[in-house]
Amino acid sequence: GQRVENHSNIVSEAALTGKTINIIDAYSSTAFKFTGTKKFDRGTGYRSKSFLTIPLKNAQNYVIGVLQLINSIEPQTGNVVPFGRDIEPLVEALASQAAVALENQNLIESQKHLLDSFVRLMAGTVDAKSPYTAGHCQRVPVLTEMLTQAACDSAKAPFADFSLNEEQWYELHIAAWLHDCGKVTTPEYVVDKATKLETITDRLHEIRMRFEVVKREAVIECQQKMLDGARNGVELKQILDERLRSLDDDFEFVAECNRGGEFMDEERIQRLQQIAGIQWTRTLNDRLGIAQEELNRKSQQPEASLPVKENLLADRADHIIAHDTVVYSADPLNPYGFQVEVPPHKYNLGEVYNLSIARGTLTTEERFKINDHIVQTIVMLESLPFPQHMEGVPEIAGGHHEKMDGTGYPKKLKGTEMSVPARIMAIADVFEALTAADRPYKKAKTLSESINIMAGMVKDHHLDGELFKLFLESGVYQDYATKYLESYQLDDICLDDYLAAD
């Protein structure tokens, strides 16, 4: 609706006009109602009389507040007297200083609000990149702060003396929300890789077509022999049928390998290599219409004359993609202290190489690329000019993949080299990942399964044992589970099984 200005209230009038107002006696004033003042006086027995109301103006001369002085006291008699006109300039000067202080405070709050909004925007962007990690960057801060509060509340060693002041809480808050900000550099098709041959698309479709070509070639070869009359037609048909059945079986095996559900032992790898040796005939130029980057890789090898026999599955030189920049962690003298084994290539798209992955769907190169998100997180956060009270943000955010025994990632820090908040975030990150129900590639684990896995990680010196004990004893795990886990995940656990072992 239309804005209505209130000129009957002295504070509103000062704010609207930007002028100082000096009232001798509120009860005899006809300019303003003083309704609130009189109600206050009736309730308290106080007698409000003289008023000096000064607008607070910032450097741009905008009114940002109002300073009001009530009941000037005459020092000799102690009586309430009007505010002298001669002191108005002095009070206005003091009000200007108050306005500067208020403006600075407002600016600090605005900057803090802007930073918070940007941090949440960044976390939301990371979560939105992939349905596989949806909500992770928003839930980890919640769990981190819950466990940190439990540590602050604990009266037992080793957390009896642990506490955070307001600035340290804010530092933890920012670090928790930005702990995976480096994932903005991780390609979605690597994070989301659901099969071994998947890149932007699943290359199994291309291999299926090659099998179809081989089958057609077998049919044509059989029919040609029948026409030549070199062998008995019935016998040739039996050989063809057996050949087609064998190819169908081979493709089913390749497709099964592509899923990544079973361990690839030596026997399976040998069969895969035998299938790879089956040849098919390519009659078209494979360098036409492709991207310049791929053409550059193919051009490193001499072009074969057509038609050419090619293996059904191949590990070619053009499948190797080199690192396009110097990897931070490849330099042993890097300024961040990263100690990471960097694979020789950025990616290896070799078909046999990918299908031979022992467990899961990721190659060594792809796993490095995913793990590299924490390196990028640290590099990104170290580049920001955090104020002194927030200088610990990179350490807290960048430590959640480290392990207590020093075998973690990316600095191989031991637990004694990490802050308590960093060790807390490691527990929060693992528990959230195990229990997350919004990951399309896996079913969320139950509460008991998750706690059991984490207990094993404590036994292997990957997670902090004291913090894990606090996680259980304080009930943080249960409070979080009640709010964020699905009903089917909320099974019973016997705490004594884990606390007694401690």
Predicted segments — roles?
Residues 118-502:
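Histidine- and acidic-residue-rich, metal-dependent catalytic cores
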Residues 13-20, 66-69, 89-111, 125, ...:
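Signal-transmission/dimerization alpha-helices at domain junctions
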Residues 65-66, 424:
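PAS (Per-ARNT-Sim) sensory domains
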Residues 1-47, 333-339, 351-357, 363-364, ...:
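Regulatory sensory and allosteric helical modules in signal-transduction proteins
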Residues 54, 59, 70-72, 416:
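Output-coupling edge of small sensory domains
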Residues 62-64, 70-94, 362-364, 441-444:
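Regulatory loop-to-helix N-cap segments in sensory/regulatory domains
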Residues 49-58, 63-65:
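A short, aliphatic-rich beta-strand micro-motif
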Residues 20, 30-32, 108-116, 156-163, ...:
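Short, glycine/acidic-rich hinge or "gate" loops at secondary-structure transitions
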